[in-house]
Amino acid sequence: MARKTVRAIFASLFGSNERRRRADRLLAAVTAQARRPVFYADLGVPDTLDGRFDLMALYGSLAFRALGTKGAEGAILAQDTLDLMFSAFDDALRSLGVGDNGIPRRVKTMGKAYIGRAAAYDAAIRAGDGAALEDAILRNVYRGTAPGGDGARRLARFAM
């Protein structure tokens, strides 16, 4: 009996391998979607660190929103995946040469930005308000500058 308890404690502290694999797969799917060349070439999303972050925030928030309808297991997978996503952001900043002292501040800023974006997207989708979603995408993904075309509208239509 004690052996089972110890395993349960370690599983709760460190998570299971299956949980990690599921989160890895979901993050890979979100990342693949956010990196599709069509967003940058055809929809005018800036192919920059900020543009890539914004598409990760958009597609991550859509995936996590869908998982929110799946009860506790969905919430756990969403949190595990979000944790991995921010760990990947941390790694990316380090690979770009951001010093150890600057990483926590930048990741905290990214976290706040993600929360704001996810809340704006979720509110618009819950309300069924395509115009509000398009406005949030224009404000966040395109930094308020309309691309030459209908990229924000097309992204909003997909997200609805």
What are these regions (language model features)?
Residues M1-M160:
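Surface/interface-facing alpha-helical segments and adjacent flexible terminal/loop regions used
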